[in-house]
Amino acid sequence: NLISMRVINPENPVINTRSFGEDPIQVADKVIAYASGLESGGVLSVCKHFPGHGDTDVDSHKALPVLPFTRERLDSVELYPFKEAIRAGLGGMMVGHLQVPVIEPIGGLPSSLSRNVVYDLLTDELAFKGLIFTDALAMKGVAGNGNVSLQALKAGNDMVLSPRNLKEEIPAVLEAIEKGELTREDIESKCRKVLTYKYVLGLKKKSYVQLSGLEQRINSPQTRDLVRRLNLAAITVLNNKNHILPLHTDKEQTIALLEVGDPGETDALAKQLSRYTSLARFSLRANQTEEKNQRLRDSLSTYKRIIVAVSEQRLAPYQPFFAKFVPESPAIYLFFTPGKMMLQIQRAVAHASAVVLGHSYSSDVQRQVADVLFAKASADGQLSASLGELFPTGAGVTITPKTPLHFVPEEYGLSSAHLKRIDSIALDGIRQGAYPGCQVVVL
């Protein structure tokens, strides 16, 4: 399993939400915990992209990013999580396609093909003894180099990932062995290392995966509950000006809900909000005329509370509306997208009374966010990476409910599958007229 380490640039086009965050210490802790869990379950963890792809604004799938930092900066920031992963004994490392002038002086030579980076730094200086992978060799960040598989092996990599033309790459490696540029011992050593990891991971004993019932085994009630709880725990209230949250339950007062994107994507939110307050739903369409935008702004201005629900990631078509949307009434922004998307409407978000980051628009998350707004559910998430000048790393306001609104069986050591069977028996008795209704007590 390939694990992206760290991102500190919110404009990073390729790592962004795949990283554990911005702070090197927190990233190291989370990577080690996650990777150790993988390896205890028989999955090799591979940390990437060495020596660090987080603070770049270029996608290495399309070009070669540059890390123009001093060695001191690399040691304290980019390299720190990798060093900790090595100390923890994690098994795999992927070298990225990056230009690191302070380590590799040859201009345009990617770190994945640099012996200074792969062997001298990773293997020798940092004493990494595990499997070393290249990033995909078909990527534009490395594609301009000839015989990339050969160069990667000579640099010290053990495995080359997705070379483009094996008919040319393999003969080039064989020719290099004949010329003494690579030794047979080099290749055999790499092969033994690969076979050793296969043995340690138990691949010799494991049978083929049984496809029958695979989906049910993977998506067990316990797994679904874990995913649900992780998603809900990530909900983050980024700010709460003048303690606008929690909102008061009041059916007499109507709150405006502005849905940015396909209105159907936030139906779960609207339905849950309607349990606590009267709701007037409005939809903002992409590329509306200024006349329609102003009419919508005027309509929203008549409400004392405005909730803006964003499920669309591409917000450029909506920028003309938000450029002039600074309502006098408190506006609460809900983002069911990765956090970096709010930077596209930064001015409007900066004026918001409250901002809640849900990360995804799953129905569970939408319902939980609605509950959080009315303090029917808790939220104590913290931002793992800063969002430009809007919010720093660690931003997060705690919302604590007075009384939990609902419960999930797995949270209390029960099985939802067993409870469904009990429900089925109870409902069957009602259908057959054995009793008009019933209550079930689980002891």
Where does each model-flagged region fall?
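Second-shell residues forming the walls of enzyme active-site clefts
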Residues: 22-186, 193
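Preference for extracellular/luminal or secreted protein segments
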Residues: 124, 145-415
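A short, well-structured edge-of-sheet supersecondary motif
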Residues: 194, 427-443
